[in-house]
Amino acid sequence: MAAGKEIRGKIKSVENTKKITKAMEMVSVSKMRKAQERMRAARPYSEKIRNIAANLGKANPEYTHAFMKKNDAKALGFIIVTSDKGLCGGLNTNLLRAVTAKLREAQAAGVAIESVAIGSKGLGFLNRIGARVVAHVTHLGDTPHLDKLIGPVKTLLDAYAEGKLSAVYLSYTKFINTIKQEPLVEQLLPLAEDSLKVEEGQHSWDYIYEPDAQSVIDELLVRYVESLVYQAVAENMASEHSARMVAMKAATDNAGNVISELKLVYNKTRQAGITKELSEIVSGAAAAAGV
């Protein structure tokens, strides 16, 4: 029964793996819910800033912030948001494939690239392809804080404000639902004019500025862009935990199927052994009776 013992060992090994993947699935479910709550909580903040900035811009049409101006520089900035950990299906692979296509397009046009990596997977990818990484932040944990993001992101924002970059792109995985996540490479700067338009029917407020309207608009637009990056990180984190939950569930289900198949093989092997032993006993008894 050496074969049977070997199969029992395989069954035990797969059962242990199944316990691990099931535990990881349950942990991902809990983290996914919390990440979704943070993602939804961040949306009203950026929307409120956008509304105020839109009203201020409408009241001061003569002033154009640097983030609204188009630059002629032959360089692009990329903020790439990925996860720190793996085991989340094709989440990072799909995003980095979209980023690669955009980078190749820029390189073919002879445009220089400056990158900021948020997440270990994106940083590793940029290092492998030899991209210029001007700043990075990793290991944000399950509760990302804006103050950890501001420093690296500010590197590209300042470069754009100084006219050194013609555009800044933000790449992340947008959370659609638990099953579906969408990799995106969106233009962050210059800000689209439509993004700061006052919506029809929306009440316009009169503000008292301290110290002046220009200073307030400058500060608000910086905060608005930072909030967009934070929102992208929150969306990516919700997508990560959702993708990991689905991947671990699939792994658990596959482990269950493998266990069922191994048990079937084990039972057949055991049955064959028993049949062989019975045949030998019957043959021996028949031989003894004939003597």
UniProtKB/Swiss-Prot annotation:
Molecular-function GO terms, alphabetical: ATP binding; proton-transporting ATP synthase activity, rotational mechanism
GO cellular component: plasma membrane; proton-transporting ATP synthase complex
Keyword field: ATP synthesis, Cell inner membrane, Cell membrane, CF(1), Hydrogen ion transport, Ion transport, Membrane, Transport
Main subcellular location of this protein, as a coarse class: membrane
Taxonomy, superkingdom: Bacteria
Matching PROSITE patterns: ATPASE_GAMMA
Keyword presence, Membrane: yes
Subcellular location: Cell inner membrane
InterPro entries listed in its UniProt record: ATP_synth_F1_ATPase_gsu (IPR035968), ATP_synth_F1_gsu (IPR000131), ATP_synth_F1_gsu_CS (IPR023632)
Membrane topology: Peripheral membrane protein
Family annotation (Gene3D superfamilies): 3.40.1380.10, ATP synthase, gamma subunit, helix hairpin domain
GO process annotations (BP): proton motive force-driven plasma membrane ATP synthesis
Function text: Produces ATP from ADP in the presence of a proton gradient across the membrane. The gamma chain is believed to be important in regulating ATPase activity and the flow of protons through the CF(0) complex.
Family, similarity comment: Belongs to the ATPase gamma chain family.
Record text on subunit structure and interactions: F-type ATPases have 2 components, CF(1) - the catalytic core - and CF(0) - the membrane proton channel. CF(1) has five subunits: alpha(3), beta(3), gamma(1), delta(1), epsilon(1). CF(0) has three main subunits: a, b and c.
UniProt-listed HAMAP family: ATP_synth_gamma_bact
Record's protein name: ATP synthase gamma chain
Lineage: Bacteria, Pseudomonadati, Pseudomonadota, Betaproteobacteria, Burkholderiales
